[in-house]
């Protein structure tokens, strides 16, 4: 009989232990839930504070007074003399800096980041160009001149300070289309480890009055902040053509943009870590003000490649391709007289397509010769179309 009581007592005690464990687990889960709810409550409190807090007023610093107060031009209208909050670093308060004011006491509570126009921001090449001088054929003299003007002042400015001369501020590359002007600019940016800012001059021609000049100004400001940097202005004749008085609003806006570009070229130090490279196919129509000393001092012609240059360019492109061993570079160069570097690249691509159509994985000499013939026919057709257009226009 006593054994039965012992069994019942043992069973009840084990149930109690199990119940205690369940209650402990329940308490732990409730504690976790309470902690999550507390975090959620704090989050919503912070969001409520954000929504109920009054908006700040944007202003631009005009001057810093001797007593530490600041003269600002507020976006709401008047100029104000305001104090600076204690948590703001006084070194950040400079003329031209954007700040945020509270609405009650007009105290500077925050220094706003530098504003950048989206159009200007997209001009910057974030990744460094991967073009090297070894990928450019037949332009040894042009590379030498470009390195002297752009790369040397960026890497060793002390040489020019010691001698007492200022290097050219800008370089103008001119020549027929497809001769490698853009590749030269990218190569010098690669070798000098500089930020490459590529812009086509037609992007400066904006719809509204003053927009083009503002973009030019902000472009140069960004280049100074990102220094060392290289600004490459392609097709500069789009805004740099000779000024003529035809009276249209569009022409006047382009002239204002050109004048802003000239002012920016005049306004920076040649030994600063910013260099300007411009390119054009039509140097004959450029405004003389662009070409005068002190702006684009070094003017470099990038001509069509000669026999040796074409041989080098063919060698550069064919080294990257699967070709047969019997390729005669001299013959290819002879057959492609008058071709630019871009034309030679097209020849190599066209030859590769011919091999692909025939189911081969190697390019033959015949493919290259046929490709030259095909490109030549296209070039002749384009020239004849141009002649007919000029005749009947």
From Swiss-Prot:
The lineage of its organism: Archaea, Thermoproteota, Thermoprotei, Sulfolobales, Sulfolobaceae. ATPase which is responsible for recognizing, binding, unfolding and translocation of substrate proteins into the archaeal 20S proteasome core particle. Is essential for opening the gate of the 20S proteasome via an interaction with its C-terminus, thereby allowing substrate entry and access to the site of proteolysis. Thus, the C-termini of the proteasomal ATPase function like a 'key in a lock' to induce gate opening and therefore regulate proteolysis. One of its GO terms (cellular component) is proteasome-activating nucleotidase complex. The gene is pan. It comes from Saccharolobus islandicus (strain L.S.2.15 / Lassen #1) (Sulfolobus islandicus). ATP binds at residues 178-183, 317. Residues 391-393 are annotated as: Docks into pockets in the proteasome alpha-ring to cause gate opening. It comes from the Archaea. Consists of three main regions, an N-terminal coiled-coil domain that may assist in substrate recognition, an interdomain involved in PAN hexamerization, and a C-terminal ATPase domain of the AAA type. It is found in: Cytoplasm. One of its GO terms (biological process) is protein unfolding. Pfam families: AAA, AAA_lid_3, Prot_ATP_ID_OB_C. Belongs to the AAA ATPase family. Homohexamer. The hexameric complex has a two-ring architecture resembling a top hat that caps the 20S proteasome core at one or both ends. Upon ATP-binding, the C-terminus of PAN interacts with the alpha-rings of the proteasome core by binding to the intersubunit pockets. One of its GO terms (molecular function) is ATP hydrolysis activity. Keywords: ATP-binding, Chaperone, Coiled coil, Cytoplasm, Nucleotide-binding, Proteasome. This is Proteasome-activating nucleotidase.
